[in-house]
């Protein structure tokens, strides 16, 4: 259910996300390739199967092996990724390989049981000034730490995500 209010938009889920018809990336006004990884991550626990077809970049699925380590059911064949929704994801230590894939790992971590640690935050910080803070405003439990004592732009910082209390 979607309702507009003076202070924002309220979304209420009536249950599990459902798989969507094939997601095909395309130049504007088509589905943006930059959104593909995050949407894929959001659908990891959906009911059904979603097919992603990457028509812009040849090598856009660097995040998939990390998602699979968390229990995602994803099969890759060239530019096609087939995502079968699973009941649950398991927390893991994962590595962001790029900006969009890193954001996808954070989203997956919020769905997983346990504490997920996402390494190599410098990729994520290139495009999101404060992703942990922004998601915390939505109720996410995210902690960022610098494990090597370097500057804030050091690639060593990590983000730990905890699923919300209501996650199943």
PLM region descriptions:
Residues 1-168:
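Short, structured segments at the rim of ligand-binding sites
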């Amino acid at each position: 259910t979607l309702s507009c209010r003076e202070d924002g938009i309220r979304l209420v889920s009536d249950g599990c996300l459902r798989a969507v018809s094939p997601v095909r990336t395309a130049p504007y006004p088509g589905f943006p390739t930059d959104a593909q990884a995050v949407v894929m991550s959001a659908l990891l626990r959906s009911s059904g199967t979603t097919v992603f077809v990457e028509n812009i970049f040849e090598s856009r699925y660097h995040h998939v092996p990390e998602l699979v380590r968390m229990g995602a059911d994803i099969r890759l064949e060239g530019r096609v990724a087939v995502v079968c929704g699973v009941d649950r994801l398991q927390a893991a230590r994962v590595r962001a390989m790029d900006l969009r894939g890193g954001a996808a790992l954070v989203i997956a971590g919020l769905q997983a049981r346990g504490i997920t640690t996402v390494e190599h935050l410098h990729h994520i910080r290139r495009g999101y000034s404060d992703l942990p803070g922004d998601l915390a405003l939505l109720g996410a439990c995210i902690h960022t730490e610098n494990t090597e004592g370097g500057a804030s732009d050091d690639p060593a910082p990590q983000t730990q995500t905890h699923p919300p209390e209501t996650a199943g």
